[in-house]
Each structure stands twice: as C-alpha cells, then as structure tokens.
Amino acid sequence: VREVLLLCWRDTGHPQGGGSERYLEQVGAQLTARGIKVTLRTAGYPGAPRRERIDGIDVSRAGGRYTVYPRALAALLLARIGLGPLRGVRPDAVIDTQNGIPFFAGVVTRAPSVVLVHHGHREQWPVAGRLVGRIGWWIESRLSPRVHRDNQYLTVSLPSAEELAALGVDNSRIAVVRNGAEPVPADAPTGAAETRTDEPTVVVLSRLVPHKQIEDALAAVARLRDRIPRLRLDVIGDGWWADNLKDNARELGIADAVTFHGHVDERRKHELLARAWVHVLPSRKEGWGLAVIEAAQHGVPTVGYRSSRGLTDSIVDGATGVLVDDVAQLADAVGELLDDPAARTVMGEKARSRAREFSWEQTGNGVYEVLAAAARGEHTAGLIAPRPVD
C-alpha cells in the first residue's frame, strides 16, 4: 500500500467534529509515518482552507453537510481524467467513512473501498426529521449493505461489529480495530490523589448534541444535590445543543453547580479530567467511547449506559466503570462511587491500567493490516489488535 484516500463528512477542525473524525485522522497520521501518501477529502466550513496539510495528510475540502458526498464523488470522477482537486490521487485503497451515510466511493473508483462504520445510527436519525430520517436509515440499513456486499468493513468495537452483522454484513468481512489514545501531555497533570478537587466532582467529556444525552448527567446531579450539597459537574466540550443544556441546568436549579467549559485545549482537558472523581458518559449511542479511555488515563472510572452498545466494550462493568440502564441507576451509581473513596480508587486504577493497552500506533498498525489485505483482494475478520512495531 503506497497511497490511501480517506473520505469523511467532517474533519477534526469542523465545529461539529468528534471522535470518529479523530480516529480517521490519527489513522491517517500513522499511515503517513509509514511513508504512505494519504489524502483526506471532507466538507468545508467557515474559515477552513480548501486545501492544507495536517500531520502529513493532504486535506481537500468542499461541500456541506449533505453536498460533501456528491462533490467528493464528482472529484473522484474528474481525477480519473486528470482534472479537479483530487487529480493525481491514485489510491491503492479507500476508507469510506459511513457516519450514517457512506460516500459509495466504490461506484466511481477502481481502488478497493473499506467501509468504516463507528456505530449504527438508527436511534439518531429521528433528529434529522421524519422524511430525512427514514431515507437515511434506509440508505444505512438497506442500500449500503447491498451496494457494499463484497466490500471489507472496518469498525471500532465488538458491539458495532454485531450491529453490522444484524444488517446483513457477513462476519467474514468485518474487522474490528479499536480506538487508540494519545499520551497525557507532558505539561499536563496526571490524575492522582493530590490532583482531585476537595469537593465531589463529576466530569462529562463530550460533544454537546442531543444523542449524547447530557441532560441525564444534569438530572443525576440534581438527584444527588440534596445528599451531596457540594457536588460539582464539569462539562467539557461544545456543540449546537449547548444553550439547551444550560437552560436545562437552570430549570433543574443546579446552574451554580455546573460549569460549561466549552472547547478547551488538550492541556486544559487533561487538567479537568485529572481533578475529577467520576466520569459520566450518558450517550444514547457510542461506537467505542474514546472519552472513557481518556478519563481512565487519570484513574477516573466511567458510569455509562449499557444500551449505548459501544460502552460495553470500552468499560469493563464493575471493574473499570459501571454500566447502568436508566437515569435513576446512573445517579445511584455515581452517588455510590462518590461516597466510597476506596472502591472508586480501586476501580480508577483498574481503568488506568486498561487505558495503557491502547495507542494510536497500535490502531494504525491494525488498520494498515486491513488495508493491505483489501489491496490484495482479501478480507479480514475479527478483532485486529497488533502490538506496536519495535
């Protein structure tokens, strides 16, 4: 494999970029470190240049939320005759990221396409409206599996692999390469007894969008406030749903206990995680839950929903965190951890130990294995978990 094309509806610089975009760009950076030429085609957004180079990746941007797809396909078609923004791009493999909707790159390119799916979007489509939601789910659940019936699939967790199989994708074509994690920055504190706040502090690290259900974290704090008067909640991240969440905090009477930090840099993010006692991730759906591992790097256990599917892979229930089924159980689990420092510390240290198992180098190596096999016309299946190259 000498050249790879990455297709994704957003990049990490996009105001709504998140964990799925981070996964793809980290993989791209690992591939460039191998000497592979990597191009990322994605959507534009205000202030973003049409072309730039980031971590060795050539980034090409055009289109918006929905037009990014046809414009990418048009660019691929033009590239075949030496025209357009992707002229000169001759990939040996393509990663076609399906965030609900794939690019269907295989229709216009001769290179083998690997379909990257972080998780299914059935629960998220209703936010787009009834008509768009029904069309989107039909594309994701019916059209895409049919069009890609011979393609390699790549996903980030075992539960997501099960979801793909339920949509009719053969298990023999589903490879799982889990997320990595970046080391805690050298200039940031690492979670320890001396970094924790004096007052009980819960942290949420997430994009602020409806399916992340941050309302449930607010509700849990409201339930616990009478019993734990000094309880604090730090919300790290931003998104178009932020104002609704701030209104919700006021309605619950806990605005004075909640700090919305918005987007922060890496050092500040880790500083906030290092001072927390418990991390809450109440998402309706997660492919993996990168925030679980980032909190774990600081010895902070996570409480999240079993129904999110992906968290059943990133959290070892009862060991590195707690899986629950509703907001009442969420509040109870958080309260129990806040009340029991010994149990919280043991669980946090187990989480920290597990976090050391994940690195972007390993993720990059695993994805390279999948791409190399696809370039040879072979399929890869199961959990791909290579150790770093010495």
Regions found by a protein language model. Give the residues of each.
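Conserved acidic donor-binding segment of nucleotide-sugar-dependent glycosyltransferases
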Residues: 316-328, 336-342
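A short, well-ordered alpha-helix in the C-terminal region of glycosyltransferases
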Residues: 230, 343-357, 366
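Membrane-proximal helix-turn-helix segments that form the acceptor-binding/catalytic region
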Residues: 131-154, 162-163
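Short hydrophobic beta-strand element within catalytic cores of glycosyltransferases
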Residues: 301-305
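Conserved donor-binding/catalytic core segment of Leloir-type glycosyltransferases
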Residues: 154, 190-221, 234
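Carbohydrate-associated surface elements
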Residues: 159, 180
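Nucleotide-activated donor-binding/catalytic signature segment of Leloir-type glycosyltransferases, i.e.
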Residues: 246-264
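Aromatic "clamp/platform" in nucleotide-sugar-dependent glycosyltransferases that forms part
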Residues: 284
